[in-house]
Amino acid sequence: MRVYLGSDHAGFELKTFLLEHLSTAGHQVVDIGPHAYDAQDDYPPFCLETGRRVVADPGSLGVVIGGSGNGEQIAANKVAGVRAALAWSLETAQLSRQHNDANVLSLGARMHDAVTAAGFADIFLATPFSKDPRHQRRIEMVAGYEAAPGPQVLPTT
């Protein structure tokens, strides 16, 4: 599987680790950057480009990495068609794919050691979307809003 990796300075070391780990596991890994450590770099360009590449390459997935993973997830989710999920456990990584068909995983390098974070990436990449109609319906609701934002019809009880 093709996997796009993007980070900032806080995620640089983990990105380097994941590049090797995922390549060894047989994935075709594309390093979006940064390609050198720069303590002053900003995550948005790397995360936005990672998201853009994932959307433009059906069947691929992405991983964005920062200190907490929060800003990186927010940035990636600004790309139309991206469903980026912040993982903090094996279960959240797995469910993001299984229930939400997430196509970008966000990781906090300051929150997890490299081996734990690699486990999150492994399960994310290995888990297929369930295609359960209720999950598909919810994804379509969000995509519909993305295409035409506006007031929502709220369900009545």
Q: What are these regions, as identified by a protein language model?
A:
Residues 28-39:
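A short beta-strand-loop structural module common to alpha/beta enzyme folds
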Residues 2-6, 10-11, 90-157:
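C-terminal binding/interaction regions
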Residues 46-87:
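Helix-adjacent hinge/juxtasegments
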Residues 6, 32-34, 87:
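Conserved beta-strand termini and adjacent loop/short-helix elements that scaffold enzyme active sites
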Residues 15, 47, 72, 117-118, ...:
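A general structural signal for well-ordered alpha-helical segments in protein cores
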